[in-house]
Each structure stands twice: as C-alpha cells, then as structure tokens.
Amino acid sequence: METFLFTSESVNEGHPDKLCDQVSDAILDACLEQDPDSKVACETCTKTNMVMVFGEITTKANVDYEKIVRSTCRSIGFVSDDVGLDADKCNVLVNIEQQSPDIAQGVHGHLTKRPEEIGAGDQGHMFGYATDETPELMPLSHVLATKLGARLTEVRKNGTCPWLRPDGKTQVTVEYFNENGAMVPIRVHTVLISTQHDETVTNDEIAADLKEHVIKPVIPEKYLDEKTIFHLNPSGRFVIGGPHGDAGLTGRKIIIDTYGGWGAHGGGAFSGKDPTKVDRSGAYIVRQAAKSIVASGLARRCIVQVSYAIGVPEPLSVFVDTYGTGKIPDKEILNIVKEKFDFRPGMIAISLDLKRGGNGRFLKTAAYGHFGRDDPDFTWEVVKPLKSEKPQQ
C-alpha cells in the first residue's frame, strides 16, 4: 500500500497574529450587534506594549474600540508584561475612517440596494473543501492540530498546567492512503507542540504534561503507535512570547483558519470583515456547498470555487471538483449546487444570518478555525441535503 505524509499546523489564541484576528472580529461583533448594516474592514497589529486597530468602518453603532481591545487581550490571558502583553497598561492606537464613498455606492448604493442587488465588496475567488475522513468532514491533520491548540488553552485556563502561557503552536503530520481520490488516514506520524511557558518549569515536565494532558485527550489512540514522533518544545526554551516575542497582524493565519493546506485558498482573510466582503461570506457559502455535497453522499471529497467582481451581485464562476470520488459526474453536481445555493453576497448574508453580531459570534471564529465547528453560530456548517435527479430515459 503506497502512502504519503501530509502536515497541518495551528496556533493558539495567544499567538500575536491570532490576537489580532480576535480583536478585529470582536470589533466586528460590537458593530453588527448594534447595527446589522455596519460596513467593517478592521485590521489589527501588535508588538511589544502596543495594539493598533485601523481600517474603514461605517456604522451607527457606538463602539469603544479601546475597551474592546483591552478586554479581548485580557480574556486571552495577556495580563502582564511577563506573559507578553499587559492588557490594562499597553498602548492602544486607533485609526479608523469611514468606508470609501466610491466603494459604498458601487457595492450597496449607500445602503439603498435590496439584498439581491448588493454587489460583491471586492473581486476575488474563494474555495470550500470537504472530505469524509472525519465526522466534521474536515482533514484529520488540520482537525488534530487545531484541537491540540484548543486543548493547550483549556489546560492553561483551568489550571491543569499552571506553567503554561498564552502563546503556542501545534503541528501534526498524518500518514494517508489515497483511495481513488478519497483520503484515508492511517496513522499520526509526527506531533509537534511549541508552547510558551513560565521560568519555573523544566523541559522534562513540559514534555510529560503535554503528553498526558494535551496529546492523550486529543489524538485517538488508534492513530498513535511506537513509531509516532513527538517534538515537544524542540527549541528548548519559549518564555518570551505573545506580542513581546513576535509582531502580529490580522489575516496572517488564513490556512489555519480554513483547511490546513488541503484544498486551495484564494488568499483573502476573514477576520474583521462584514458579510459584503466576499473573502469571508463567499468562503463560508462554498464550505457549506462542499460539505453538503459530501454529507449527501454525492462525493467522498470535493472542492468548490466561486469568484466575484466588485459591485456585481452574481458570481463570475462556480467550479466543482470531486477528485474522482463523485457518484455522478462533476458537471451534474455543479448544476445541483448552482440550483440549491444563492451565491449573491446579499443573499448569502441572509441565508447564513451573517449580519448578526454579539455573543462573540465572529470572535469565536477567530481562533481554532472557521470550519468543522459544532456550534449553532457557525451557520455555514449546516448541511443542505442535495439529491441527484435521475435523467429521464
């Protein structure tokens, strides 16, 4: 049996890039909660003792940007300079302007267009992917890397491993078998965890705790064997972390946010963007389409692409590839998808309820992945049953 190795990585909510994603989405939530028609393009950057939010926001909402920045950093665990940032003492810079009137008239006619007339907020192409290798219909390498990161945060916050600090990265290599285009995981080849820690803990304690409290609860035993390789804090020391260790920027972790390197990516980031930004809404609707294709048994694995022009509601193209796993021809699946899904941005916002903020709705997406999550707020994960109409004889 010929197998191959494939690797996916993830980062924790305390990674500086992910801190920025969460701040941007916390601001989006606050705007949408008060004004569902808010137009938000919010970027965040951070370095030692500083967080800056900048971009274009047009909203009727009354939003205290500085307060949101500090509370988001605090809830992640950045409560002192020792851990990489002090949420209460750091400098918060704000440079937010209104959306360009040129863009506003072209996309939504200064809020006068009906939902079906709203144009795409920009050009671009987005991909959705699904695979039957996990219950989530997501790639196993990505699922395991993501869950390891989430578990690291859990044992830090609940006190199981008090030596942990907010920053951290994970990476999982899975050995796969290609079964006529479908991906079948055989075993976990390598597990890598690099986590920020305090001064008190030894490398042996770190390795023992990570194996017992992080890896064991996350990776099913059937995937681990005596040949599985573990790299646990291989650099030997990771005390300085968060924005003190590295600069952070919104939209720098787009593969972690999506499919861990599987499928394809159009390059557009998600966080800090309202649903007229097709980078986000377009990617969400094609995930729903791809997941629905696999969940409905039309294929074992598939990718869906959609593309847009600024100001134009209808997509320029829709593409489906089932990697040879389709039960019916890809062309037929494409026709079903085009019939069952409305790819116009204004209609995506309605069908996936994307104008609803609050309750950390989008903040939740900004760490540990936008897809494969079991949460009613992740409306794009709801499967639409798809059936092939048998052609008339």
From Swiss-Prot:
Named cofactor requirement(s): Mn(2+); Mg(2+); Co(2+); K(+)
Recorded catalytic activity of this chain's protein: L-methionine + ATP + H2O = S-adenosyl-L-methionine + phosphate + diphosphate
Keywords of this entry: ATP-binding, Cobalt, Cytoplasm, Magnesium, Metal-binding, Nucleotide-binding, One-carbon metabolism, Potassium, Transferase
Chain positions recorded as ATP binding sites: H15, D167, G168, K169, S235, G236, R237, F238, D246, R252, K253, A269, K273, K277
Main location (coarse class): cytoplasm
UniProt cofactor note: Binds 2 divalent ions per subunit. The metal ions interact primarily with the substrate. Can utilize magnesium, manganese or cobalt (in vitro). Binds 1 potassium ion per subunit. The potassium ion interacts primarily with the substrate.
Positions with a binding annotation for L-methionine: E56, Q99, D246, K277
Alphabetical list of PROSITE patterns matching this protein: ADOMET_SYNTHASE_1, ADOMET_SYNTHASE_2
UniProt subcellular location: Cytoplasm
Molecular-function GO terms, alphabetical: ATP binding; metal ion binding; methionine adenosyltransferase activity
Enzyme category, top tier: transferase
Gene Ontology biological-process annotations: one-carbon metabolic process; S-adenosylmethionine biosynthetic process
Sequence positions that bind Mg(2+): E9
Keyword Iron: no
The keyword Phosphoprotein appears for this protein: no
Cystine pairings recorded for this chain: none
EC number: 2.5.1.6
CC per GO annotation: cytosol
Description of how the protein assembles with itself and partners: Homotetramer.
PANTHER family according to UniProt: S-ADENOSYLMETHIONINE SYNTHETASE (PTHR11964)
Functional note: Catalyzes the formation of S-adenosylmethionine from methionine and ATP. The reaction comprises two steps that are both catalyzed by the same enzyme: formation of S-adenosylmethionine (AdoMet) and triphosphate, and subsequent hydrolysis of the triphosphate.
NCBIfam families: metK (TIGR01034)
Family, per entry: Belongs to the AdoMet synthase family.
Protein name: S-adenosylmethionine synthase 2
Organism: Populus trichocarpa
Lineage: Eukaryota, Viridiplantae, Streptophyta, Embryophyta, Tracheophyta
GN (gene name): METK2
